[in-house]
Swiss-Prot record:
SUPFAM superfamilies, per the entry: YhbC-like, C-terminal domain, YhbC-like, N-terminal domain
Record-given protein name: Ribosome maturation factor RimP
Role, per record: Required for maturation of 30S ribosomal subunits.
GO-annotated biological processes: ribosomal small subunit assembly; translation
Family: Belongs to the RimP family.
Keywords recorded for this protein, A-Z: Cytoplasm, Ribosome biogenesis
UniProt cross-references to CDD domains, sorted A to Z: YlxS_C
Classification via PANTHER family: RIBOSOME MATURATION FACTOR RIMP (PTHR33867:SF1)
Subcellular location: Cytoplasm
Pfam family, one: RimP_N
Cellular component annotations (GO), alphabetically ordered: cytosol
Amino acid sequence: MTDIARIIEVVEPEAKALGFDLVRVRYFKGGEIGDEEHTLQIMAERPDTGQLVIEDCAALSRRVSDRFDELEEAGDVLIEDAYRLEVSSPGIDRPLTRAKDFAAWIGHEARVELSELLDNRKRFRGELKGFDAETQAISIEDDGVVFEVPFDLVSNAKLILTDKLIAASRPLDTSGADEILEEQED
């Protein structure tokens, strides 16, 4: 059994060493129909931009791979199965995994799933209205009703792609794009 908490314990310092915040770590089998391979998915971001560029992803991937190799050589095998390592930026319709994610995206639409029933339901979809840091509760308006959702009940949440979200998001880093266009024109 793969211990995600242990993997996070190893990955987070590697991300921090590069100046990144860890957004999410997931370990899953498949992803596409017929795909039996396991994937270790690591999402991270630069605190100032909320994204990573490809070079950042490559740097974190190398650090994590090297650290996992060191631990394995010392007899500490974190993942028994063969797996694919996937390092990425959270993207525009990002997952909301930390309290600060909910606070940062107030006013935007989100889909929130809970680990147990709240008002006879586990799924909410609507505008994030607030986050109470003291009670650790998320306010989300769904069909005109505002629900107070305890953060510790959230099992999965992500932003919903809307025009408002696109307008509010920082553009991706386009450095190097001119060189690519010039090469294609020649």
